[in-house]
C-alpha cells in the first residue's frame, strides 16, 4: 500500500481533527470496493465486502426492523452509489440484500455495546441540567492523586448539587454584570424546579436565604477518589449531555437561527467538555485512560499524537484548578467559547490581542470572520461574544482587584484549550461508546432532540 503520497497534514484545521493518511487508515481497503455503494470497503461485513457506512446502515435497519418506502415514483429504481446512498433508504436496503448481506448475521451478533450517551438521553430527556444524580463511583483508589496531577487532591463538586461552602468567595452575591451584557446574555444555570430563587434583572440568579438553608440540610457526597477509566467515560458522557442542556438554557443563543445554533455548537463542544472536566472531574486518571486507549489502538502515530495532546489537556486542567475558578467565571468562559467570533482555525491570539476590552464592537475583522463561516446572524454573535468578555472582565475587576492579569490569564487558558483536538477527546472518551457516529453528529442530534 502506498504510504504517504500527497502527505496530507495530520491536523484538519477546519474541523480541528485528524485526517488519516492511507497508511494510518489501515482498516480501509482501497482496492476492494463496497458491493453496495462502490465506496472503499473496510472488510467483510455480514458476508460481503462493504464500507462502514453501508454496514452500519444495514445493522441498524435489521435490529430496528425498519420498513422503508421508496421515495421515487419508479419504485426500486433509485441509484445507490457513494454520492446518492443516503437519498433512498428503501433502495439502499434492497441493494444490501441483493448483493448478499446476511440479516441472520446481525440477529445472531451480540447486542450493541452499552451506549452511555443514548442511555443518558433516555434518563435525562426532559430533565434540566443538574436534576439527575451522578453515577455511583467506586471506592478504590487506583493511583496516587498528586503523582498523576502534579497537585494534591482537589475537591470535586458534583454537578447538579451546590458546590461546598467556601469554594466560591462570598463576594459573588455582590456581582452585577454590566448593563451591556444584561441586555443580551442570560448566562444563568437552568432553574431547578420548585426551588425559590431571586432572579435579578441581569439574568443571573442568587438563591434566597430559605433556599440556601434547605440546601445546607442536604447531604453532599464525599469527594470521590480517582475514578477508573470506564467510570471516567461514563461521567464524561453525562457531562456531554448536560453541556447540551446548559446551552439550551441560554436564551440569547436559542433566539439565533437554528443553523447558527448548530454551527456554534459544533465549534464549541470541545471547550465546553474541557471546562466541565476542570470544574467537576479533577483530579483525573489520565494515565489509566491512556493505558486503556493504547491497548485498543495499534496505530503508533495516532497514539503518539493523542499522548502529546493529553499533556496539553492536563496543563489546561491544572491551570484552571490552580486559578480557583468560580461558577460565574466558568459560565462566562462557556459563553465566550459558545459565541465564538472566529472559527477554531483562526488566529489563536485574537482573544489576547483584544484583552483590553471595553464594551465596544471588538476587532474589525470579527464580523467578517463570522460571515465567512456561514453565520446568518454574525453581528449578533460578535456582540454577544463581546458582552460575555465584558461580563467576565468587569466581574474580575470587582472580585479580584489584586489580580490585574487574571482576565488575560483566563483568556490564555481558553486559547490553550485549542491545542487539544476534538479527535483526541472523541477517541479517548467516546469512541468505544459511539462507534462510527461522529461526536458532532451525536451532539447535534441531541440538541435538536432527534432520535439517533
Swiss-Prot record:
Offer an example of a GO molecular function term for this protein: nuclear receptor activity
Statement: the UniProt record of this protein carries the keyword Zinc: yes
Tell where it localizes. Answer: Nucleus
Low complexity: bias regions: 360-371
Q: Which residues bind DNA?
A: 31-108
Q: What residue intervals correspond to the zinc fingers (NR C4-type)?
A: 34-54, 70-96
**Ranges where the NR LBD domain occurs:** 189-450
Q: Where is the signal peptide?
A: none
Q: Which GO terms describe its biological process?
A: Bolwig's organ morphogenesis; cell differentiation; cell fate commitment; cell fate specification; insect visual primordium development; inter-male aggressive behavior; mushroom body development; negative regulation of transcription by RNA polymerase II
Known Pfam families for this protein? Hormone_recep, zf-C4
Q: What GO cellular-component annotations does this UniProt entry give?
A: nucleus
Give me the ranges of the annotated region Disordered: 342-371
Does the keyword Cytoplasm belong to this entry? no
Question: Which residues lie in Polar residues bias regions?
Answer: 344-359
Name the InterPro entries for this protein. Answer: NHR-like_dom_sf, Nucl_hrmn_rcpt_lig-bd, Nuclear_hormone_rcpt_NR2, Nuclear_hrmn_rcpt, Znf_hrmn_rcpt, Znf_NHR/GATA
Keyword field: Activator, Developmental protein, DNA-binding, Metal-binding, Nucleus, Receptor, Repressor, Transcription, Transcription regulation, Zinc, Zinc-finger
Query: What is the protein's major site of localization?
Result: nucleus
Q: Report where it is expressed, by tissue.
A: Brain and peripheral nervous system.
PROSITE patterns listed in its UniProt record = NR_LBD, NUCLEAR_REC_DBD_1, NUCLEAR_REC_DBD_2
**Subunit organization:** Monomer.
Cited function: Orphan receptor that binds DNA as a monomer to hormone response elements (HRE) containing an extended core motif half-site sequence 5'-AAGTCA-3' in which the 5' flanking nucleotides participate in determining receptor specificity. This receptor binds to the consensus sequence [AG][AG]AAGTCAA. Plays a key role in the establishment of non-metameric domains at the anterior and posterior poles of the embryo. It may also play a role in the nervous system.
Q: Which family does it belong to?
A: Belongs to the nuclear hormone receptor family. NR2 subfamily.
Q: What is this protein called?
A: Protein tailless
